[in-house]
Amino acid sequence: MMESANAILDQRQNCGVRKVLHIDCDCFFAAVEMRERPELRERPIAIGGSSDRRGVIATCNYPARTFGVRSAMATATALRLCPDLVLVPSNMALYREVSQQLMAILSDYSTQLEQVSVDEAFLELGRDEHASSVAEGIRQRVRNELGITVSIGVATNKFLAKVASDWNKPDGQFVIRPNEIADFMTTLPVRRIPGVGPALQKRLELAGIITCGDAQTWSLMELVRRFGRSGASLYQRSRGYDSRPIHTERVRKSLSIEHTFAHDLPNPGACLAQVSELYERWLTRVSRTPWKAESLAPFVKVKFADFTQTTVADIGESASEEGFKRLLQQALTRADKPVRLLGIGGKFPHTSEQQLSLF
């Protein structure tokens, strides 16, 4: 705990020194498709699988969002909300090409560049550079050279910059200046903190924590006792603290997705029936990274009703739907019990750095 307190003190002392930009493409996949097919610009479109294959929406444009369509939504649900929705097959080769062009533009402004995903990056500038002007220049270049738009947040650290980039979407920028952090954080809803999902948000609401200002009334010890590691992170983020550096060669170890079922799955057949939907959701997440699904070493995680769990991995297996099913069958032979949670994922090759995760 003393180490955490010292880290927070260091962040207070260093606050205002750094100039960090978070660059986030606006509905990237859809934007690239609209660039290629201008006739789609005014129509609601989504990148995703067909409804008869239990597909999942990877992203959609803003006209589609007015109907309630969202990323990670089942395609069948999206079509019910918007019957005129145009489904466009993904073109990952093209998206990666545009992503590389984007990173090339960003690298012109600083060597301190961290690519977070295919459509997102952090950039740190020198102390003497005018961050707002740089952000405006980047947005103009991306618009003119790539035919898409980005939104940019500017702040003293990565967390605040990421929050800021979502403030004036699309094709906008927002600056959180050092002397504005305290007031800004007081009114910021905790749900706007990256990593606070619906489950944690509900727990926080039950504790009376709606805004970051509410969280600031809790001591570090109280938050840790109530929320564990999430409480320690919340203590720092609710005050706008984040000492993470820019990782110029950031490498993830793995990418996975899990689902806890409202009712335990009673048998292997019921478990195997869930793989298709999990796989589609996992592919959506993989598509937002620079990697291809087939290059990942697959693994399956099973948590049984009694909270025991097992993981099966096989570097010789393919990271395909059928490959995950075969691994799941192996895992289920290890215990004859109902299942409460299933997870699938893939390990990236030759990685050693831990994933960065807030919660």
Language-model region placement:
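DNA-contacting surface of Y-family translesion DNA polymerases
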Residues: 205-341, 350-355
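Gly/Gly-Pro- and Ser/Thr-rich, intrinsically disordered tail segments characteristic of DNA damage-repair
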Residues: 1-226, 232, 343, 350-355, ...
